[in-house]
UniProtKB/Swiss-Prot annotation:
Function: This protein may play a role in the biosynthesis of the prosthetic group of nitrogenase (FeMo cofactor).
Keyword set, alphabetical order: Nitrogen fixation
Gene3D superfamilies named in the record: 6.10.250.1090, Nitrogenase molybdenum iron protein domain
Tree of life domain: Bacteria
Descriptive protein name: Nitrogenase iron-molybdenum cofactor biosynthesis protein NifN
Classification lineage: Bacteria, Bacillati, Cyanobacteriota, Cyanophyceae, Nostocales
Length: 444
């Protein structure tokens, strides 16, 4: 059981967390024909857009209600109305995801009433789904905003219908990359199941070149698929943060669910594969038996480099849980853990303590580590401390292929093992080289 600590300071120095609105927009981008709409100032949207564009290296559709000093005082209903009508006219979206920001949450705009009144005044948009997620960026973090968006989606769009025994809903949390979702989709379909991902950034943000420019997402989960979620026989929630959305589906449609908090490592993947076999009443495909043996061999090859290594992590709670459990299974020691927001998982972490803080806290705690794990904002810390840095999370600016990176399943687990193992090998070679140079030149 970990002790959760919060540093006693009134300012974030070198922040680790990203805003809830950014997380919600990421979730909305996993829907086809979507354009996320930020109800706030232009700067809020511009910052989120820059982060996502630099991370995925893709064109990201984001819109804003462009609140000013005057409209903030007088109220933002007119801005929302004009923004929605403009998007409908110029972009023809199939669905709009509306996110609040710290500015409009502080003012207290009643956005749900605004939307009702706008629909009453404009019956021509009555067919258009508009999903609202409350995402104040003065509290919580990316993971919270992502979860809030998914909960709003499953609360508003799915419709009741006849249960389809082969159909499963997969609620994919913010810890999973587009490459992760593609791997999970391949595994699930191999068992003869028909998955509906909510959301499916594996289809929309996987880095593909469309024939022409579009101001909305061209791939992802469709509105029709979202409406059919109520017909699923089972819900698979990937990440503890998706439990709330799974409960909503259980309450609305009496659909049972199971939460998988991790899909990296031999035992978690075994449990996932076994659950799919039971759910589908099909045997495990031979290719996954072979991949399992490959992972076992990879664990044998790499465990010499992992044993007793001290690792410090700065990640969102769901991702932190998954990596801590995986790294400990390989014999490493968790030297420090810093995260962004509260989660039921934090107290259950099998480490001494976890800090909800910023990168200043992380730099102080990570001294004498053998490896740092976190997003690209850790790069300067890694350089100052002369410690190798394994990039994980959002944003990653200084590496290519973030949309295709995979860390789940047997194959993804091997990718993580080899990636971290090679860093340990490079660090050891550099240490030996420095020792030899100092020995030859006589420096102590």
């Amino acid at each position: 059981m970990a002790i959760v600590t919060l540093p006693n300071k009134s300012v974030a120095v070198n922040p680790l967390k990203q805003s809830q609105a950014l997380g919600a927009s990421l979730a909305f981008l996993g829907l086809k024909g979507m354009i996320p709409l930020f109800h706030g100032s232009q700067g809020c949207t511009a910052f989120a857009k820059v982060v996502l564009v630099r991370h995925f290296r893709e064109a990201i559709p984001l819109a804003t209600t462009a609140m000013t000093e005057v409209t903030t005082i007088l109220g933002g209903e007119d801005n929302i109305e004009q923004a929605i009508l403009t998007l409908v006219e110029k972009s023809s979206p199939e669905i709009i995801g509306l996110c609040s920001t710290g500015l409009t949450e502080t003012r207290g705009d009643d956005i749900e009433r605004f939307l009702k009144d706008i629909r009453d005044r404009h019956p021509e948009i009555s067919h258009l789904p508009i999903v609202f997620a409350p995402t104040p960026d003065f509290k919580g973090a990316l993971q919270d905003g992502f979860a809030a968006a998914v909960e709003s989606i499953v609360q508003e769009i799915p419709q009741p219908g006849t249960t389809r025994s082969e159909q499963v809903t997969i609620l994919a949390g913010s810890a999973f990359t587009p490459g992760d979702l593609q791997e999970i989709k391949e595994i699930v379909t191999a068992f003869g199941l028909v998955p509906i991902f909510v959301p499916d950034i594996g289809a929309s943000l996987d880095g593909h070149l469309d024939e022409e420019y579009s101001s909305v997402t061209t791939s992802g989960t469709t509105v029709k698929q979202l409406q059919e979620v109520g017909c699923s026989a089972f819900t698979i929630a990937l990440g503890e943060s998706m439990r709330g959305a799974a409960r909503i589906l259980e309450d609305r449609f009496n659909i049972p669910y199971e939460v998988f908090s991790e899909l990296t490592g031999l035992e978690p993947v075994d449990e996932f594969i076994q659950a799919l076999a039971i759910l589908s009443s099909n045997s495990v495909p031979e290719k996954y038996c072979r991949q399992r043996r490959q992972l076992q061999d990879a664990m044998l090859d790499t465990h010499f480099y992992f044993g007793a290594k001290r690792i410090s992590l700065a990640l969102e709670p769901d991702l932190l849980w998954s990596m801590v459990k995986f790294l400990q299974s390989m014999g490493t020691q968790i030297h420090a853990a810093v995260t962004t927001t509260r989660s039921p998982l934090l107290e259950q972490l099998p480490i001494k303590s976890v800090t909800i803080g910023d990168l200043e806290d992380f730099e102080q705690l990570a001294v004498e580590s053998d490896l740092l794990i976190g997003n690209s904002n850790l790069a300067a810390i890694a350089k100052r401390l002369s410690i190798p840095h394994y990039r994980l999370g959002i944003p990653i600016y200084d590496r290519l292929g973030n949309g295709h990176y995979t860390k789940v399943g047997y194959r993804g687990s091997m990718e993580v093992l080899f990636g971290i193992g090679n860093l340990f090998i490079d660090a050891e070679e550099a240490r030996v080289k420095n020792f030899d140079e100092n020995f030859v030149t006589g420096h102590g």
